Amino acid sequence: MDKEKGLLIVLSGPSGVGKGTVRKKIFEDPTTSYKYSISMTTRHMREGEIDGVDYFFKTKEEFEALIKDDQFIEYAQYVGNYYGTPVQYVKDTMEEGHDVFLEIEVEGAKQVRKKFPDALFIFLAPPSLDDLRERLVGRGTESDEKIQSRVNEARKEVEMMNLYDYVVVNDEVELAKNRIQSIVEAEHLKRERIEAKYRKMLLEVKK
């Protein structure tokens, strides 16, 4: 039977919900076989982040040059910074049969949905907006004004969870990781994803 094309797994949610933490937990698991699609951004590197591992960090000028070159699946501006997903790596990796894991902001996920309607969209939600505020304050990296801006944005983003296939509440990182892995495993077993392969196999048997 032909190799199954990989899934594009899109993990999205409000800033501060713990997308990066959950993603790291998933990739620390030795059973994980997904390939991570590293996003590009113009925001400042946070303590502990590594260029080319967590993000590709670019200047605004570099990023805008890549936009003109049509080098992104999606890009968006969020709280004054650009975020984007380089396109070629994603396409090539999926064709090789690997699942590609993409961690992006909500605005970017909307663009991906238009270009990759068959992708798997998972919304990572906070237990509450108060919990989200506490996480943002706990980072100790932003002013009260910027934190309030992110919480206000999160309110709008939570209202858009109906655009996603699944919602995972990040009340505990290990549980969120397990839920996401279970969703991906189940998605591979969906009839629509394998029916075409079997139809082709049956046609070849008849020849």
UniProtKB/Swiss-Prot annotation:
The gene is gmk. It is an enzyme of class 2 (transferase). Residues 6-185 form the Guanylate kinase-like domain. PROSITE patterns: GUANYLATE_KINASE_1, GUANYLATE_KINASE_2. The keyword Transferase applies. One of its GO terms (cellular component) is cytosol. It catalyses: GMP + ATP = GDP + ADP. Keywords: ATP-binding, Cytoplasm, Kinase, Nucleotide-binding, Transferase. Its main location: cytoplasm. HAMAP family: Guanylate_kinase (MF_00328). ATP binds at G13, P14, S15, G16, V17, G18, K19, G20. SUPFAM superfamilies: P-loop containing nucleoside triphosphate hydrolases (SSF52540). It is found in: Cytoplasm. Its EC number is 2.7.4.8. This is Guanylate kinase.
